[in-house]
């Protein structure tokens, strides 16, 4: 469970240096942050931030619009749908406000709705929670004018923008509120962040004294349980802690309870028979059968007194919490949990629960690690758990002496249990006034301050996150003893405190204890003496914990005197006292292993604790304070995984009045301290629960014992390794540390009467070092006592030193192992390279020319090459200068130079026509690269027939070289010229196997085989590679002998080639085909085809070879008969190869002549085969092209068919949708049209508007009466061409303008402003409407301004033309302002149409405010003074048409109209079917004479909707009639 720190932004100045701000979650992972006090500029701010948590550096500052709230802090914010509601807060001048603002997170616009009802008084530091999806619960806060905090409740309806304050019964405190009035939609509530604020303070470097726990509300003490072991609430004026289970202190008369449910009683653990559950109870939850039994017993009770008494003991309260601010409130499962806060004088830590359904207050008794009193903290709900973080824990939150913390608490409502969570990682700094939000299962901490306001401490550019799914609750056991019936007690960690007395170091990891007896009864007070007994320690297994068990020492201070009433209110002291008092009640389970991680031995340490309490002896439950005497009392100390046996010393050392608690370490007199391991556990309870726990503990014990044995064996092995390493390792630091630890002078623990004491330590490596002990009998016993602090310090040093030793040893082992593996891999790779080069050189005929100098024996070369190492050694003996270094690597491919760099190496004579290998990697082998470079220029000039013939001759030479035979008789000169043989041994592979291996790897990608340049002619000089830095050095002395030897070998080998077998010939053909592959002019894709093409030529060449053999045989017969044999039948070659046929060199000339003819025929055949292959390839290409075109055509047809089907489906769906729209729009008079949208022409619209301004102001029913549709269509077409035809009647032109504006796509007011304007109209926010108008594109804005100006002039003359602002808004509302997607729901469409018309009406009435760049007056359309008269609707007379109100804007602000004219006309309608329309008066349900205010947004304006429908229907009727 670890905190992580995340950057807000890449920008260094993008920090949230505020406190008292608020934040809500918008969507899934976006956070909206607003307001707060910026302590860098020392004033509030109203900046809005958006934090995208799914992105890195996701903090942005959007551009907002609308009516922004003023700079405030201490406010609250609640997210409801896509709107964030902000309420209250404090301004810079310490003045509070009670305004409600809302922020639309979809378009980043602010608005201020006009709420109904009585709002709460101005406040800050309150809490706001969301209930029933659309209601906000406001509780508490502070108002500086009233000089006292608040505890009232207000509920805000976000849909109706209305406030409601539930009333309360003064006698019972019950809140009278009907939950059905707010019509909850579902029982599921969404946890919402509450804004809490507090003053900042610097955390002092010294320890802090936490403030007292608030123990009463409304000056009445909280009822404590009868068994006074619960220290959650302490009375600051009373230090009396009763230890009697049978009685308790007197209580004040509690208030009566109303509407208490049995399920609530069961959930809070109310027992039967007058007994109650203790604050530390670990009783199992009630089963349904137990609840049924409880219900029946409750129903059987006739005395109401017993029931109310049991309810009081359970902690229920019907009175509301005390007044407070800077508290926290979270909603879980229909209940609001209010915790902590500040009441003006004291910090609070009480918890109240408000049942939202019944509106009842409950104050439960909680268990566990109750948080210290705090304010300015935050609380969030994740699942069914409540988490509380940070806050001010001491002093006034607004003072400079306040202190903060960063503790994280968790509360489980089902168990009423608090847990202090221990976290790691990058913890948030202690802070207050921050925000805490739940994102899925994560806790996010943003902003806040850990300093006072005038300190300007700026937090880092980060926010913190904690994943709650990784919480391991196995460490946080729920335990306690209720009435002496529990067998498993868990002592929780002790919190820190300070005083002026000496400090003692205690650790916060205490063991599990088992009660010595099942009850602890005592009738009176008196003296209670704890008798020490022998017990052993049971260590909890934490080996499965994800993080190692790390000790954390906490300073625990003793009081100045034995009287504890000074610090009795401190939770830390009380917890410590309870720990010391309960130490003698429990005995530790025997048979516990010595350590989880291999502890060698346990030191026996006896800790002396003397505590006196002054008071009366023999007092009863209501008497004086009892005296608890604990002589040489037990004290438990558990350092990490080290267990210290607690031995009871019966010697009475009177240290009670020594001025403080004396804590020391000493050993028992006259005894050896040791641990007796028992394999069995003592079971003192026979209940099924005890038996179950006993079995689980026994299994755990056996498992831990087995682990201990295994770890001990590992430790012994490691000690041996350390000893060997100390003697052999060059690192002396580790061995010196071991010697230092092993020396007896490092740790001296003296014992009484020469008693042997053993001290052990453990580390995270589970392998402790045994430490030698010493007995100093000469020291004084009074001066030889080692304090606990000294031993803990020594133990820490030992742990750190040994941990360093283990880390050094592990690092050294890794480095040694890595070095061995690296060397082994390097040697293996080097040997593989050597073997491959040796194998390659043996294949290409260079095995006798060089070898590797094998300094380190390779295990690979002997296995791969057999006796090749012996050949290398012989060659090295003959030529010691000719050596190649072993250092061949990928990074440095250059073969190291020989010892004599500047001397010329004497190379051996190579074979004439050798095949060389060139690697295709970036770092070729240098030796082979030199050979290739020398032969590269010659190969590039050979033609294909020449290379074929050269490859053929080269194959003959290699065949003759690779199969040496010792001749029977050799001249001495020839023997000197021959290369040295290796004791007559033949190569390990034959020629045929070598060439088969080459043929099988003909497609290898590592390189190509090339021919040397010596194959061009038989008389060319041999190019011999050298292996020095100068490749051009050649031994000139051997040139003549080499040429002579070459000519002789060519003749002998050519003749011997005639008698070679067919297999050898086929091999030569394969090699020649392989050599053809190396030509760069052929592309890689055509190589396989070339092989097939040349196969036929090779077959023909084989046939020619057979003919040559027959011809040679005939020539030999003739020569034998004439006696012209050259060299005899046993003539030998240079290489010792015997001519099989015994022929001489006299037939060489005839063979040369036949080879020229062979070349010509081979060339012709090759050309013919190439032509045939080319034709075949073209045919295949054409065939493939046809197949590809066919497949593409088929695929294209499929795609066209699918696209056609899709278009048909879309057309059908579109027709259906259009029919549906036509049906819906036909109801409201809108005619559906499939015509394409017309282009937007600003100049055309301006001309039309100017024409209407000059000719239509006095025309009755302008824009209302329809004209001739044919004329209207003609005018609209002229609009599209840019030349409007304005020679028609004015009604035709006005209707053409309406049709043209309706056909624009996008409309005159673009789609993206539709929802924004609707929200602003709904909230009656003219300022937001004005801001949105100035965001419209410039051309649209100019046209809209001219159009609204025309409507203003028409409405000013409404007494003549009968068209006021409301009638004009009905005409132009759905025309110039419409959504991107039509609304299908009829009720939603009706509401949408009302808002559309209302926006146009606002444009007309607030023309000078909205359309002026610098308005001279504010908006007046929402003042509510000129609401229309609803009684005028439905009358048969035409309502009076008022002139514009005095506040109605005109083009000239100085000109206003103040008179009102009343006219009465009879209503007439025309139904003739002529093409020319007749003048008609306006229906009374259509024309509204009064200005419309908020009536459009209220249910009373349905008549206006009827007017819209009637208007649209009349338009449709007139259009159909004219058509």
Swiss-Prot record:
Biased segments, Gly residues type: 615-626
Compositionally biased residues, Basic and acidic residues: 905-915, 1155-1194
Coiled-coil portions: 690-729, 812-840, 1151-1228
Annotated Gene Ontology cellular component terms: cytoplasm
Subcellular localization(s) per the UniProt record: Cytoplasm
GO biological process, one term: signal transduction
Residue ranges of every copy of the Rho-GAP domain listed in the record: 1233-1411
Positions of the record's site feature: Arginine finger: 1264
Polar residues bias locations: 161-173, 184-194, 212-221
SMART domains: RhoGAP
Kelch repeat feature ranges: 30-76, 83-133, 135-184, 335-384, 386-441, 443-496
Keywords of the record: Coiled coil, Cytoplasm, GTPase activation, Kelch repeat, Repeat
CDD domains: RhoGAP (cd00159)
Annotated segments matching region Disordered: 161-256, 510-569, 609-631, 647-671, 748-786, 861-881, 905-927, 963-991, 1006-1096, 1143-1194, 1425-1482
InterPro entries named in the record: Kelch-typ_b-propeller, Rho_GTPase_activation_prot, RhoGAP_dom
Residue spans of biased composition, Low complexity class: 195-211, 227-244, 870-881, 971-981, 1012-1030, 1043-1079, 1143-1153, 1430-1476
One MF annotation (Gene Ontology) recorded for this entry: GTPase activator activity
Function: Rho GTPase-activating protein involved in the signal transduction pathway.
PANTHER family: ACYL-COA-BINDING DOMAIN-CONTAINING PROTEIN 5, FIBRONECTIN TYPE-III DOMAIN-CONTAINING PROTEIN
Name of the protein in question: Rho GTPase-activating protein gacHH
Organism phylogeny: Eukaryota, Amoebozoa, Evosea, Eumycetozoa, Dictyostelia
